[in-house]
Amino acid sequence: MDFKHLTQFKDIIELDKRPVKLDERETFNVSWGIDENYQVGAAISIASILENNKQNKFTFHIIADYLDKEYIELLSQLATKYQTVIKLYHIDSEPLKALPQSNIWPVSIYYRLLSFDYFSARLDSLLYLDADIVCKDSLNELIALEFKDEYGAVVIDVDAMQSKSAERLCNEDFNGSYFNSGVMYINLREWLKQRLTEKFFDLLSDESIIKKLKYPDQDILNLMFLHHAKILPRKYNCIYTIKSEFEEKNSEYYTRFINDDTVFIHYTGITKPWHDWANYASADYFRNIYNISPWRNIPYKKAVKKHEYKEKYKHLLYQKKFLDGVFTAIKYNVMKG
């Protein structure tokens, strides 16, 4: 597959509010790949890093298929507040729509791959984060990490993913080493040297591989990185699903996953901390940053899609908001048909 045309950006917007300009290689570079639904997530992810790492110099990169004036203005205010630089890369998603995707795994999952390819010619390393990740502690240890010939540094996925992934990918070596791609610190020198973008698309073009995939980009990245990655401790990708609140019915359950050592909280699942029904202590790590950000006067997101209504009404009933819960359940059933 000719992938070079996939990284042709419609526009690149630089929001540089630093009093002293630095070359990108003199800073720690962090990127996100988003569609419109994850705009606020990426913004608060940036704000959370800055709030917890005020002595470090960063360059932030957002690859997005949708940008509007309000979002750009709010990001500009964020950059001004912290005297940092945020770069926006407006990508045309149409060429990517031929790649495997679903309602749960949209085309934007491939933006991380494109960021690795694009920045491999410009930088030595890059931290990629999913836009549902919040930082709650210092990145000093991660910034100090040095690579040899590893492709990057990753965090092993939750236990429930290990044996299933090994079976699906037909390799027992993944049982205990299958990682979650939401946090990836990439050695871009090795990415370029090993021509990993080409290898990714070679695997994606192999029918025998495609039929094994459940999480398209994550599975392929695991196939590529097996025996070639540094393993980071769990604190760099503490995975928590907010639906656990009504499933476990325990307001302290989240503390099994999020604790004093946690650096990155990864809010997986349908309900995100920016949804208006995510009224839990576990979401406060996001909401506390939100409330001191340029987004603070903008209401949290309402349910729009059917699967959001399905989960929202369960949360509302658990929160004893019975009337709202019943109306939301009715709305869900009408949408379900």
Identify what each model region corresponds to.
Residues 1-34, 188-337:
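A glycosyltransferase accessory/donor-loop signature
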Residues 29-32, 49, 59-61:
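Hydrophobic targeting segments
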Residues 39-53:
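Histidine-anchored nucleotide/phosphate-binding helix
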Residues 58-66, 154-155:
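Short internal beta-strands
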Residues 70-118:
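Active-site-proximal specificity loops/subdomain of glycosyltransferases
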Residues 88-94, 108-163, 178, 183-186, ...:
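GT-A fold catalytic core of metal-dependent nucleotide-sugar glycosyltransferases
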Residues 99-108, 166-171, 246-251:
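Short, surface-exposed amphipathic charged segments that create phosphate/polyanion-binding patches used
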Residues 152-173, 279-282, 295:
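A short, conserved beta-to-alpha structural element at the edge of catalytic cores
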